[in-house]
């Protein structure tokens, strides 16, 4: 009987064991290929966002300065003046590496950063904040889990310092992913308990395995080249060889005029047809009761800020606008929205994060927004006028003064006068 079982399951067991050996002993040395790194940087795929190997490969290339551009779905709004297109066409001394997906917010960005901490130390980043992240209801666990993997988990566990950031991150992770691996260790961190030597040994073993697995499987991307051609190369020929904002504005304006003809909200035709028009009546007054002032997202944002401060990263924050006509149609309160922007800015500026491009009041400008809440056309040019000098003439990070009060529930739910918060 045992012999028959071995004949059936033995080969499977041996094959599985050999795969584990292959992964564990797979070489993790990085070989650079600038073309492939550009493909990955502009692909804006789930893999390029959450896999370690693709990010590290680009960010450590000595022949090109890739800069993390962190956000969510705004990066997929490609046109002739998108940041990736302008950087490539005019051979900027940097290239954006886009890290974001629809549905991702600060918590996903925090765990993604854990994979690249040595590679962002004392460098620069661009971080786009959408006030729409700051909802009263926590975002769905499924949305978080879609962009989270075991390598992010063990990277966090190796990097954590047992401080308030570690406690908050562990607590949030247990809530967003209740069946997460190494749950017992996370529970210790969430309670502020010290880890044992055995805990650290387990973390180290899992971390090495996850790194090797990322090196082996994370390098494969069949979509990267096609996406780069679609997202970047196809637009290069439309731009003048000599850089000029006036010329670029004319191109962007003509493109916008030609592609916003089927609606009076200034939205791109395709987006309006497939995302708005079919449910137009449903959207009327839809955001009347929205409140961006009370949200756990403020605490999650503090996780990211603490990490930037620890890593001495000089960050440019960009605050997105809302399409003014869309705001009026859905009855989103502009007073509430601007109050939320004020709260976000206070959390940033009071701790030394003073590089802020605030476009929250530009939502009524023609061709500034491509759909409901995302930059496009003239918005991308305004973005470039701030981002390009920030990255072309890099300065060291300021001396940040972090305030743990921003991890409190008091702050997350505060909706009063910002100046009165103690």
Specify the residue positions occupied by each region the protein language model found.
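Membrane-embedded segments
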Residues: 74-165
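C-terminal regions of proteins
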Residues: 99-101, 335-336, 342-422
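Short loop/turn segments at strand-loop or loop-helix junctions that form parts
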Residues: 71-72, 127-132, 272-279, 318-323, ...
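Extended hydrophobic/aromatic segments used for targeting, binding, or gating
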Residues: 88, 283, 293-299, 304-367
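Secreted/periplasmic serine-hydrolase-like ester/acetyl group-modifying domain
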Residues: 36, 156-300, 402-422
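Hydrophobic membrane-insertion alpha-helices, especially the h-region
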Residues: 6-27
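Loop/turn elements at helix/coil->beta-strand transitions in domains of secreted/extracellular proteins
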Residues: 64-66, 94, 121-124, 310-315, ...
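Membrane/wall-proximal cationic-aromatic binding patches
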Residues: 30-94, 111-112
